Structure formats: C-alpha cells, structure tokens
C-alpha cells in the first residue's frame, strides 16, 4: 500500500491547532534549573577579563561557568581535532561564541545574571570571506590543534599544520569522461 498522493493526518495536529501541545520549554520539573549563555558580540577578539562575581551573588543563581572554571581541564571538543572550546577561553572567534553560562532557579534570574557579567575585549582583525580566510596571511582562528582519538576515518585526512584550512582530502577515483559517457 502506498501513501503517495494521499492526505496524511498528523497525530499531534489537533493539539497544536488548539495550543495544547507540550514543548520542551513548557515542561517544569522539581529542582529544574534554567541555563542561559552569555555570547560574544565580536567576530574576533581577545578576552582580557571576565568578571562574574556579581552574577554569582544574585539570589537564585546556582552556578556560573566561565573560562576560569576550565583551567587544567580538557576544555576542547571536535570530530577530527579538538579545536572547539566548550566556551571561549582566551579569545572569541565568532559572533555568538559562548563566554559564560548561568544556571538559575528561574529563566528571568538567569537572564538578569547575564547582564551582571562583565567582559572586557580587545578587538582583533576579523575575516568575513571564505576565500580570504584560506589565505596564509589571514588571522588563524584555531592555533591549537589537539588531535582527536575518536574520529574513525581520520586517517584519510591530511591535517594541515597551520592556517585556517583544517584538512585537505583529494578524491581521485575512476575516469570522469567514461562516467559521463556511461550515464
């Protein structure tokens, strides 16, 4: 039996239409905390200072995570190389990179705590074009490259030692002209 061309009823359709559908944001559990992230407004900048002391003192704030909490820990992740920090440590590399995270008893408390975190930046040169970013003289975004041990096919990647290009992977299999003639 084929359902192509037939109307399909959605089991959740009526609840969505009535506004009765439950979403993750609608769920409240005992002891649940709300987490909000403070994000960079700079495309590329050195982080000179992060002061979360006022946010930590706000009633209802349970925890504030900043770069200071990551010292001495494995703070990087990534599928091929671990080059993505859990949150910004020395600098930010894009608008929206997480600088700090706040866990609080209520959403509005977490949002208020974000406003109390002070961050001082030193803007750095930024590149807004893919081809410009690939040039050798472009600012390098990921200077540290810790090779990941968990990527199953990483042996096929030729990791680059410098620059913004992580890997070059050359595919050369078969005869293109023959492939087109046989298609």
Which positions does each model-derived feature cover?
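Flexible, low-hydrophobicity surface segments
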Residues: 1-176, 183
């Amino acid at each position: 039996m084929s359902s192509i061309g037939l109307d399909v009823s959605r089991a959740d359709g009526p609840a969505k239409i009535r506004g009765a559908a439950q979403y993750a944001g609608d769920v409240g559990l005992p002891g649940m905390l709300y987490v909000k992230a403070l994000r960079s407004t700079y495309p590329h900048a050195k982080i000179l200072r992060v002061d979360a002391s006022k946010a930590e003192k706000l009633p209802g704030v349970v925890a504030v995570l900043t770069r200071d909490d990551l010292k001495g820990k494995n703070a990087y992740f990534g599928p091929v190389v671990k080059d993505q920090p859990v949150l910004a440590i020395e600098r930010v590399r894009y608008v929206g990179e997480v600088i700090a995270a706040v866990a609080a008893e209520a959403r509005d408390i977490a949002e208020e705590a974000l406003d109390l975190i002070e961050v001082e930046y030193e803007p750095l040169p930024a590149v807004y074009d893919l081809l410009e970013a690939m040039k050798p003289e472009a600012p390098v975004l990921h200077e540290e490259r810790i090779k990941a041990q968990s990527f199953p096919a990483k042996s096929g990647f030729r990791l680059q030692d410098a620059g913004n290009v992580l890997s070059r992977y050359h595919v050369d299999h078969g005869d293109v002209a023959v492939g087109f003639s046989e298609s």
